[in-house]
Amino acid sequence: MANFNKVFDDIKDQVGGLAEKDLKDFSSQGKQDADTFLTQSRSKLEKWMQLLADKKIDEDEFRWLVESQKAAAQMEALRKANAGTMQIEKFRDSVLQIVVKTAITAAIAAI
């Protein structure tokens, strides 16, 4: 499987760009929230990516596992900065989509 640290850094870079593009005035809070979520979820993501690469779970199961972490992605800094609820939820969902897409691509490349 691809080096997890490289994949994880790629996810963080993509999320940072997303925050700057979609959140504009709230980009620093979005980056902070995404980084907190990714750091808290890192060990789970690594385990699930390995299971996916080893074909012990399929893409749908991986996607479900990542999306089950939605509650963990609280986005507190964005809420405290009074970013709109719809904007926060859209950003959170986009972060999860980046995680899924990047991890699946890396796992497929490893096969």
Regions inferred by a protein language model and the residue ranges of each:
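Cationic, hydrophobic amphipathic alpha-helical membrane-interacting segments
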Residues: 1-111
